[in-house]
Amino acid sequence: MKKVLGVILGGLLLLPVVSNAADAQKAADNKKPVNSWTCEDFLAVDESFQPTAVGFAEALNNKDKPEDAVLDVQGIATVTPAIVQACTQDKQANFKDKVKGEWDKIKKDM
């Protein structure tokens, strides 16, 4: 009985690891450039890396070349939650368009 309980408990403990590995593999298979991302692609990124993705999307022009040598780190921290909220409402929208739209709103309020 103890062996069976140990096997069941061990299996339950491994379930989140297997699930996270599948999610990580799915994210690794997605090799689209940031300019081609949908909001769904952005939301699939780990939450701690979302500000970095916003920074890349804001810095790159349509030819995937950097436009500015300086990034507004404080602005990225401010705009990222708004982009997450906007992307949650429309997951099929173009991520770069959402970034531009939310940046415009933030800059207008400054």
Swiss-Prot record:
Signal peptide location: 1-21
The keyword Amino-acid biosynthesis is assigned to this record: no
SUPFAM superfamilies in alphabetical order: Protein HNS-dependent expression A, HdeA (SSF47752)
GO BP terms, alphabetized: cellular stress response to acidic pH; chaperone-mediated protein folding
Any one GO CC term of the record: outer membrane-bounded periplasmic space
Transmembrane spans: none
Entry similarity comment: Belongs to the HdeA family.
Name of the protein described by the UniProt record: Acid stress chaperone HdeA
Lineage: Bacteria, Pseudomonadati, Pseudomonadota, Gammaproteobacteria, Enterobacterales
